[in-house]
Amino acid sequence: QLATSYETMFENEGENNVESVFEVQYTDAEGAGFGCLQCSEGNVAVGFNGIRNHTGPTYDSGYSFNVPTQETVDSFEDGDSRKEVSVLDIEAWAEQTGATYGLGYEHTGYYNRKYIPRKGDQNIGDQNLTNPNNYRSIRFADVLLMHAEAALETGDLSTALTNVNIVRNRAKSSKRT
């Protein structure tokens, strides 16, 4: 089944929830280093997705890789709650909170909010290399959308629309007909 709240889906408290089909489990156990990234028991990607030189509330700093493009941001429909969960507009965030940050390589003004390090999540010994945030590989929403695609390919438009609209309803997006 779908989790009732998408807002906490990618936070630590949303790990292994009712919607989770498969998550890569991570811990904050120390052991990683740039000479041995494979030694990490934590999610290295979180540190790489973080805001470069961030100083402010909620988020810790990172390396500013894997940033969303304007095209990605524009692909969300008005009212789609997944946009705020998925994308952080760093300029709006800085204006709202007084946070400061540096410009990373290929700066777009946006960050992958799902996987920005949160204050208190990082293991100090492995700064940015050992984050306990699980990677949500397959969620039930993904299964519904895969089933919708398979149904569409076999000519079952009704099932395809039903499954797409289940996911869209949770995101508070308009139904497809």
Q: Which residue stretches match the model-derived regions?
A:
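Structured, solvent-exposed acidic/aromatic patches
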Residues: 1-39, 122-138, 153-163, 173, ...
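An aromatic- and glycine-enriched ligand-binding surface/loop that stacks and positions planar moieties
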Residues: 1-101
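Active-site oxyanion-binding pockets that recognize sulfate/phosphate
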Residues: 66, 131-134, 148
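Short, hydrophobic/aromatic alpha-helical segments in well-folded domains
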Residues: 71, 146-147, 163
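Flexible, polar/acidic helix-loop-strand segments at domain edges
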Residues: 71-140
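Structural register within alpha-helical repeat arrays
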Residues: 140, 147-149
